[in-house]
Curated annotation (Swiss-Prot):
It comes from Solanum lycopersicum (Tomato). Induction: By nitrogen deprivation. Its main location: membrane. Ammonium transporter that may be involved in ammonium uptake from the soil. This is Ammonium transporter 1 member 1. The chain crosses the membrane at residues 47-69, 90-109, 129-148, 153-175, 195-217, 238-257, 281-303, 316-333, 337-356, 368-387, 418-440.
Amino acid sequence: MACSVDTLAPFLGPNTTNAVAAASYICNQFSGVSDRFVDTGYAIDSTYLLFSAYLVFSMQLGFAMLLAGSVRNTMNIMLTNVLDAAAGGLFYYLFGFAFALGGPSNGFIGRHFFGLKEIPSNSFDYMNFLYQWAFAIAAAGITSGSIAERTQFVAYLIYSSFLTGFVYPVVSHWFWTPDGWASPTNSNLLFGSGVIDFAGSGVVHMVGGIAGFYGALIEGPRIGRYDHTGRSVALRGHSASLVVLGTFLLWFGWYGFNPGSFNKILVTYGASGGYYGQWSAVGRTAVTTTLAGCTAALTTLFGKRILSGHWNVTDVCNGLLGGFAAITAGCSVVEPWAAIICGFVAALVLIGFNMLAEKFKYDDPLEAAQLHGGCGAWGIIFTGLFAKGEFVDQVYPGKPGRPHGLFMGGGGKLLGAHIIQILVIIGWVSATMGPLFYILHKFKLLRISSEDEMAGMDLTRHGGFAYYHEEDPKLGMQMRRIEPTTST
């Protein structure tokens, strides 16, 4: 709203000089107040994005607990989670943020903001880096689960740095920046719609899952995972309690992952001052996220009960996370009832891919490739089917009436764009992470020796087990410091 001296002065009285002076004073004051409101709006949006970044970062603790509970080598897997965050932070600062969001640029890769040079800018501030970094290390954390318990430490360092510094940022540039060739905010939309991968079923989950697939495939299964007849042998993790704790921490963090991807909350839809705005869409996104995860958890519970004959808490946790991974693409543009469909099918996808993994003797300790890669791909297809036109126009304004979900009367163009997204992500990650893992394998930098693997990486590579147990029954469980010994 603007204040005009010429418009306001006639209402202040017949004395023209005083009226003009008074109007000028009032308009100046009004302008100052208006500027403060603008500043307040920026502050609210910045606080919202920062809080969302903190939630997404807390997912690293969830990953750590989930991984620690699902495997036997606790010290090793905890160290790799810390490494993912630390190495990812440095390399995303140096290169990743620039490759992802460094516009103006071409449709393939960004070329500004290396080392956060020229930040803050008109487009981005420091909180954007923090939020995007949290996403990048989430992708690296997904990959670490697939290659757990048999991978050398140097391999973790190399793949994590490469994934967060180059592979993931390029994909996020394609789909999340105005310059990206398939972005829904590009001036030249792919198939007239662009790709709607709102919070990253493809950008984050498929990238991390496919990278993990190649790592686990090239390494081969863990020793003892299949017996001499080829029959599957369950290598259970050491703590179901940590699995459940990690799952709930990830659930909590997902409320920053999906709703936080709006980046702003103080946006009105329609006339200013209405009760319906982006804050409502944020709430709807949290609801769709919740419903998809809950439905997937229950479907997996009963599905696995039918197949295996027992109730398994780990299966339920993985099903829940599979539902979250699937809804991440379309969480902001689908109705709550559609999220239930998303979660139901995501559970079936997860169960189906796990059966294929067993058949082909593929060993992924966390089911990360099946969960994040498979369910992420389904989430992209789901969005192409169920994205609602009204919600799409609100979340991606500027080009009303663009193609939306096939089952919602929006035609098949969005679905076609999403199929292309799946194919290019598979191709890109295959062309980058596949050769990287193969080179590490050829140089004997990928897998540990069979002796170390059988003895346990915690003992052979990390100085001892994560837990100390005193064999004397009178002492029970206790913790103590173990001093290093020197050989004579």
